[in-house]
């Protein structure tokens, strides 16, 4: 049985997916920024951007124009309710010296994807997300930390190189954005597999 979320394979897979969809992701983000001021439309596009990892997890090459699909606006009530509950729970976690907030945020990190992909209630999304991430929280944390570290180092190098540093920074931002979205896609895809979960301590 293949182990879920192995470190290097997951990062490599995220990079491959990100580069395969780099144009689509960048154009989708640009379209989102250009239209974010339009009332009502901006609700759907915000939800659509949140859904990018779900689409990427299915092996699709996404269409940037899909962020304008009406189906995303149809779930705005459940989406806002879910986000509000998550923000409240994580906020309370911060009041207990940060670490509980980090654990809760990872536990619920799949909830939005489940809402948009499986069309289940917001409360069930939180429960299912917690079940999915059980035993994998450390892996998720270190995968995201590793990606953030690589992006940070690249940006630091770019800002200290004369003449071409700005180009390195811009490339790092684009690649980092695509890799971050793609890493979430890999995590969501892997956690949906029906393999037996490890009994690792949280």
Model-found features: residue ranges?
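Selective recognition of hydrophobic, aromatic-rich stretches within alpha-helical transmembrane segments
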Residues: 32-61, 90-123, 127, 160-195
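Membrane-helix interface linkers and caps
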Residues: 59-70
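A generic structured-segment signal
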Residues: 14, 52-56, 67
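Cytosolic juxtamembrane C-terminal amphipathic helix followed by a basic/polar low-complexity tail immediately after
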Residues: 194-202
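Interfacial aromatic "cap" segments that immediately flank transmembrane helices
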Residues: 2-34, 68-92, 104-155, 201-202
